[in-house]
Structures are given as structure tokens and as C-alpha cells.
């Protein structure tokens, strides 16, 4: 092997080693991204149960210590048990809420109410089972129950006023009319008429009170049965019952004149604090009975408060206040599916990937998230190993093809040697035949013997020529077959090389593109900056570099949510890109910062262009729920001087940007 071949193979080996190191760095970055996703997911899963929160805290500690093998093997069983226990407790609390709300609704249905009030109350009782299983519906159910109870009490109060019934205090302490009444039980029929249906208390509800036992006329007072006494002692304040004469154990309800939902005695297992705390909402204020609920506003406003038309493309999505897992589950599933789609898995790992995709797609709950992430980490690690194996397989196939080429070259050389041998043999045969013919002519004594000798020699010449042609045809056919096979191998290698080059180019474009805005990223900026600096050193001319930063972008994320921030970045990136020239270059440097390269542009022309870009961003009609929202940006611009490196010029433009920030933002500084 020559020295050039040795150097060429050495260069190929070094290039492949460098490529392998780049792949290793890429996989390290993906593993770090997966670890960060685990930490964010554990934070999103907190807040529902103390035991689960402790496991999530331990999970983050394990990820920080990078002790995933031993740490996760001990944590996962405890986490699964804590998740199952938490789910059981949540279901028990939900069932207690359903039972308690149902009992309250049944107590109201037991009253003598008009049909127009009983109908929504029955509908409410039928909907409790389904709606109360969602914690966000609990405050709404309590508000509806409060409104229905207020209407029922108002209806009963109106009926009592029409019947001329005495007030509650008059019945408790007696009045002028009761002193002159001869019959002590005269007030009993009015109470019975107001509530003529005995109410049987539910098993989980507190016992209803019993009224004072009226003294029967014509006889001494009789002692109350033990069960009635127990009911009186356990009766809560605010309830007055009247027992019909002769039936001391039958309980009748006389409700107070003014009572709110939170003053009712709640059945066992239901409390406002626990219910609202689980639902994550504050108690809804009571709604007056005569106030109808206003219709909901349209989802997409057409006009803002000033009556101006707004553009739906610039509408920011509403913020999500501390979402639970159910709110962030679609985002987590989409992120995991995108990560899974981005993995170039070999065919041997496709079944595991499809099984993992089925587990993620549409049915992932938060206590299955950790096992899914573990399996995804295994796939990522196996893909890194697979990349190493693919590279080794590629080198092996390359060696085999080189050996095949060497074999074809050896065969071609052997064929060439055979052709030379055949040519020399044919020449020798011709010379022998001609020499024999000459000798026969000289030795012939008569014409007949000469004729026979010449004929014999000519036949020998023809036979030698036929043999030579046959061998030549066989050799040509063999060489043609070898050339055809060699051409097929060369075509196959060309196709493989094109596919490999196309795949590398696709991966390169993905690596140089920001996935959120579609602009070139920092790596693409570094590559383009080197090209522009080299061009300027070679050809001369002007070259400007500008850095733009969105003002108060953190406040946008905090006030309106990260989805709104992402939408702002996409819109601003589109506005900047469509207003730049074809020769200009813009990249997202990171966060809310953008970098612009302006070749062949003077400093004054670049300043005017940056001012137009800032004005275009400020003119974007951003709005949130119909309210206009002003978003501005600050910028710093500078020009290359002499043989400056790109890093020094970028630092100067960055300092100009910070001067604009310190000077009040929404301005351009020239360095």
C-alpha cells in the first residue's frame, strides 16, 4: 500500500472518529433533555398527595446525583404504591362528596315546593353522580345548590307570609296571640300544614330536632320516649320540629327564615374547606335568586374595548394558572411523541418504539410517566449504541467492497495475462505452421506430394485460428460479465452514497434550525458568521451585526403563560424574516434574542433598517382577550472594522443592546 493510500485511510479514520464524537455529544444533549423533562414532569405532578410529592422530590434528587440505576430501582416500587394509594383516597373523597351533595338535594326535594322549582332540583340531583367526579365541578355544584336552596327558602317564606304564620321567635318565646289562645296545640296545625310530609333522616345525615312536647289538654305532661330525647339533645341550632300528638317519634321540619348553604349542617364526610381545597377553587359567592346568569362571551373577540377590530392571528392564549397533570398531559404526550419520532431507531428496536408510542398516545397518566420515561431513556441509550454499531457495520461493508474491488482487479490482471499467453501461443503456432509449409515445399519431389503437404499445413493454420478465436470469445464474455457486475456494484455504492449524503444534509438542516420559530439557530449563526467574515477579508466591503431583544419578555411569560410567549416569538420571527433582504441573515440566538447580519450595508443604512424592524414589531396588533397589548424591542448595532473576529464584534453589539436596555428600552444604540 502506497504512502498516499495510508494517508487517505488515516484521514478517513480521523474524520469518522470526529463524526462519532459529534454523535456522542448529540446523544449526551438528548439524555440531558430527557433528564430535564423528568424534572419538569415531577414538578407538574406535585400537589395531589404528600406521599407522591415525597417520591417526586426523591426522583429529582436522584436525577441531580445522576444515580439513575440504583436510585430508580428502589424508588419506582414505592412510587407505584404511593400513586395507587393516592388514587384510592381520591376516589373515596369523590364518593363522599357525591353522597353528601345527594343527601342535601334530597332534603330540599322533601319540601313541598312548586313544580317550576322541583324540576331544576331533580335535574341537579340526577347530575350529581356524573359532575361531582370532576373536582373542577365541585364549586359550580355548590353554587347551584346554594341558588336552588335560596329559591326554595324564598318560596317557603312567601307561603308562610301569606298564611299569616307566626315568626320563628314568636313560636319559640310565645307572643300576645299565644297567651290568649285557649288551646295550646292550636299552633301545631299551621306547622303541619306548612310541612305536612315527615322527613326521614338519611343514615349519614345528622338527626333532625324534635319540637317541644306540647302538654295534652286535660292531663299532666307525659315523659318523652328515649329516642325523642336523644333526637332533641343531638339537634343542631336553627332547626325546629313539631311532633304530631300521638306520634312522638315522627319528626317534622320547620326551616328558619334566612339560612345560607354554609350554615346548613353538612352530612358526614363533606366539608367546604376539604371540598374546595380538592377542587382548587375559592367558594363561589351566593347568587341572588332574581339574577339570571349572563351568557358567556364569545371565545374569539371581534372588537376590543375601544371598538377597534382585532386580528385573531395576534390573539394571545389565556394563561393556565398552576395546571394539574390533566392540563399539561397533552403537551407532555406531544413532546414525548416528537422526541420518539426524532429517534432514528433500527428495525430491531421498532417493536419497543411502537409499544411505547401506544402507551404515550392518548392514555398516559401521571403515575405511568416515570416508567415511560425510563423506557424512553433505554431507547435513547440503545440508539447511541446502535449508532456505534452502524458505524462499525459501515466500515465492515466498506472493507468488504474494497476487497471485492481488489478481487476484480486481480481477475482483470489474470485475464490480461491469459490474453497475452494466448496471443503468444497463437503466434508460435502460426510460425510453426508457416515454417513446416516452407520445409514441405522445399522437400517436395513431385506435384502430388507438394499438394498434400500444403493442404495439411493450411488445415493446421485454420485449426489454430479457430482455437484462438474461441478462446478470445470466451475471454471477452468473461470480462464482459465482470465489468457488468463491477458497474452494478459501483451504481449501488453511488446510490448508497447519495442516500447517506441526503440523510446527513437533512440532519444538518435540523441541527441548524430553531424548532420553535423556524429561524436558523446559534450553530447556523456561527457557520454563517465565519463565511461572511472570510468573504469580507477576501473581497472587502461593509458588514454589520445587530442584536435585538424583546422588552419585558419575562413579564409576558409570567402574566400570560409560556404558550403566549411562544406565540409572540413566532410572530416576531416572521415579521423580522419577511422584512429583511435576501442577502441578509437572521438567527434566533436564544430566548428572546435575535442576531442579524447585514452584508454590503453601510452603518447608516443598517440603522434605518433596524428602526423599521423595531417599528414593525411595535405595530403588531397583539391583543389578549380583546385588550390591545404593546410589545417593543431594543437593539444594538455595530460594524466590522479591520480584521476583527466575529466574537469581538458580537460583544460590542451586545454591549450596545444593554445600553439601550438601561436607557429605558424600546430604542436602538449604535456602537
Swiss-Prot record:
Record's catalysed reaction(s): 2 GTP = 3',3'-c-di-GMP + 2 diphosphate
Cell location: Cell inner membrane
Gene Ontology biological-process entries: cell adhesion involved in single-species biofilm formation; negative regulation of bacterial-type flagellum-dependent cell motility
Effects seen without this gene: Deletion mutant leads to a reduction in virulence that is reflected by decreased bacterial dissemination, enhanced bacterial clearance and reduced host lung injury. It also results in increased swimming motility of approximately 1.5-fold increase, and a 2-fold decrease in biofilm formation.
Binding site for Mg(2+): 549, 592
Cofactor section: Mg(2+)
Binding note for cofactor: Binds 1 Mg(2+) ion per monomer.
Residues that coordinate or bind substrate: 557, 562, 566
UniProt EC number: 2.7.7.65
InterPro entries named among the record's database cross-references: DGCcoil, Diguanylate_Cyclase, GGDEF_dom, Nucleotide_cyclase, Rev_trsase/Diguanyl_cyclase
Keywords of this entry: Cell inner membrane, Cell membrane, GTP-binding, Magnesium, Membrane, Metal-binding, Nucleotide-binding, Transferase
Chain residue ranges for the region called Disordered: 204-223, 278-298
Entry's Gene Ontology molecular function annotations: diguanylate cyclase activity; GTP binding; metal ion binding
Active site (UniProt): 592
Gene Ontology CC annotation, any one: plasma membrane
Site (Transition state stabilizer): 554
Subunit architecture: Homodimer.
Domain notes: The GGEEF domain is required for function.
PANTHER family, per the entry: DIGUANYLATE CYCLASE DGCM-RELATED (PTHR45138:SF9), REGULATORY COMPONENTS OF SENSORY TRANSDUCTION SYSTEM (PTHR45138)
Function in brief: Catalyzes the synthesis of cyclic-di-GMP (c-di-GMP) via the condensation of 2 GTP molecules. Cyclic-di-GMP is a second messenger which controls cell surface-associated traits in bacteria. Localizes at the cell poles through interaction with FimV where it increases the local pools of c-di-GMP.
Name of the protein: Diguanylate cyclase DgcP
Amino acid at each position: 500500500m502506497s504512502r498516499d493510500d495510508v494517508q487517505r485511510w488515516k484521514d478517513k479514520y480521523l474524520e469518522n472518529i470526529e463524526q462519532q464524537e459529534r454523535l456522542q455529544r448529540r446523544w449526551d444533549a438528548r439524555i440531558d433533555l430527557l433528564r430535564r423533562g423528568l424534572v419538569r414532569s415531577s414538578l407538574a405532578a406535585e400537589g395531589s398527595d404528600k406521599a407522591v410529592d415525597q417520591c417526586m422530590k426523591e426522583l429529582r434528587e436522584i436525577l441531580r446525583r445522576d444515580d439513575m440505576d440504583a436510585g430508580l430501582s428502589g424508588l419506582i416500587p414505592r412510587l407505584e404504591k404511593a400513586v395507587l394509594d393516592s388514587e384510592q383516597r381520591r376516589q373515596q373523597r369523590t364518593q363522599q362528596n357525591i353522597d353528601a351533595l345527594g343527601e342535601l338535594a334530597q332534603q330540599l326535594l322533601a319540601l313541598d315546593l312548586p313544580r317550576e322549582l322541583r324540576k331544576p332540583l331533580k335535574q341537579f340531583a340526577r347530575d350529581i353522580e356524573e359532575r361531582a367526579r370532576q373536582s373542577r365541578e365541585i364549586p359550580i355544584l355548590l353554587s347551584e345548590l346554594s341558588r336552588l336552596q335560596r329559591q326554595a327558602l324564598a318560596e317557603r317564606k312567601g307561603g308562610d307570609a301569606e298564611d299569616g304564620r307566626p315568626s320563628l321567635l314568636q313560636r319559640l318565646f310565645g307572643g300576645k296571640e299565644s297567651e290568649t289562645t285557649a288551646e295550646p296545640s292550636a299552633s301545631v296545625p299551621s306547622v303541619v300544614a306548612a310541612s305536612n310530609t315527615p322527613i326521614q333522616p338519611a343514615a349519614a345525615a345528622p338527626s333532625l330536632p324534635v319540637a317541644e312536647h306540647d302538654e295534652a289538654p286535660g292531663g299532666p305532661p307525659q315523659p318523652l320516649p328515649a329516642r325523642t330525647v336523644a333526637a332533641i339533645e343531638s339537634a343542631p341550632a336553627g332547626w325546629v320540629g313539631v311532633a304530631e300528638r300521638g306520634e312522638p317519634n315522627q319528626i317534622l321540619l320547620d326551616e328558619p327564615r334566612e339560612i345560607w348553604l354554609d350554615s346548613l349542617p353538612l352530612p358526614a364526610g363533606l366539608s367546604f374547606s376539604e371540598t374546595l381545597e380538592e377542587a382548587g377553587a375559592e367558594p363561589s359567592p351566593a347568587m341572588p335568586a332574581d339574577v339570571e346568569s349572563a351568557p358567556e362571551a364569545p371565545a374569539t373577540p371581534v372588537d376590543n374595548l375601544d371598538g377597534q377590530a382585532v386580528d385573531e392571528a395576534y390573539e394571545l392564549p389565556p394563561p393556565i394558572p398552576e395546571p394539574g397533570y390533566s392540563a399539561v398531559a397533552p403537551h407532555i404526550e406531544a413532546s414525548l411523541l416528537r422526541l420518539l419520532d426524532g429517534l432514528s431507531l433500527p428495525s430491531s428496536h421498532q417493536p419497543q418504539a411502537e409499544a411505547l408510542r401506544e402507551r404515550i398516545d392518548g392514555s398516559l397518566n401521571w403515575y405511568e410517566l416515570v416508567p415511560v420515561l425510563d423506557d424512553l431513556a433505554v431507547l435513547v441509550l440503545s440508539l447511541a449504541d446502535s449508532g456505534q454499531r452502524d458505524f462499525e457495520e459501515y466500515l465492515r461493508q466498506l472493507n468488504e467492497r474494497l476487497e471485492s474491488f481488489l478481487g476484480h482487479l486481480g481477475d482483470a490482471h489474470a485475464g490480461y495475462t491469459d490474453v497475452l499467453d494466448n496471443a503468444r501461443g497463437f503466434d508460435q503456432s502460426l510460425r510453426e505452421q508457416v515454417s513446416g509449409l516452407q520445409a514441405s515445399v522445399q522437400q517436395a519431389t513431385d506435384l502430388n506430394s507438394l499438394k498434400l503437404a500444403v493442404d495439411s499445413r493450411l488445415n493446421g493454420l485454420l485449426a489454430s485460428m479457430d482455437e484462438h478465436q474461441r478462446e478470445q470469445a470466451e475471454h471477452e464474455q468473461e470480462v464482459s460479465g465482470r465489468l457488468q457486475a463491477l458497474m452494478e456494484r459501483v451504481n449501488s455504492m453511488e446510490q448508497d452514497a447519495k442516500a447517506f449524503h441526503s440523510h446527513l444534509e437533512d440532519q444538518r438542516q435540523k441541527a441548524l434550525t430553531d424548532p420553535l420559530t423556524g429561524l436558523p439557530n446559534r450553530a447556523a449563526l456561527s457557520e454563517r458568521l465565519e463565511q461572511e467574515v472570510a468573504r469580507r477579508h477576501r473581497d472587502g466591503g461593509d458588514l454589520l451585526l445587530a442584536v435585538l431583544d424583546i422588552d419585558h419578555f419575562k413579564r409576558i411569560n409570567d402574566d400570560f403563560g409560556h404558550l403566549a410567549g411562544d406565540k409572540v416569538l413566532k410572530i416576531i420571527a416572521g415579521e423580522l424574516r419577511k422584512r429583511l433582504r435576501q442577502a441578509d441573515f437572521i438567527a434566533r440566538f436564544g430566548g428572546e434574542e435575535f442576531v442579524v447580519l447585514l452584508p454590503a450595508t453601510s452603518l447608516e443604512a443598517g440603522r434605518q433598517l433596524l428602526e423599521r424592524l423595531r417599528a414593525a414589531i411595535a405595530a403588531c396588533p397583539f391583543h389578549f382577550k380583546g385588550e390591545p397589548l404593546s410589545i417593543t424591542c431594543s437593539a444594538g448595532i455595530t460594524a466590522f472594522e479591520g480584521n476583527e473576529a466575529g466574537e469581538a464584534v458580537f460583544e460590542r453589539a451586545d454591549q450596545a443592546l444593554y445600553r439601550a436596555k438601561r436607557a429605558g428600552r424600546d430604542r436602538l444604540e449604535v456602537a
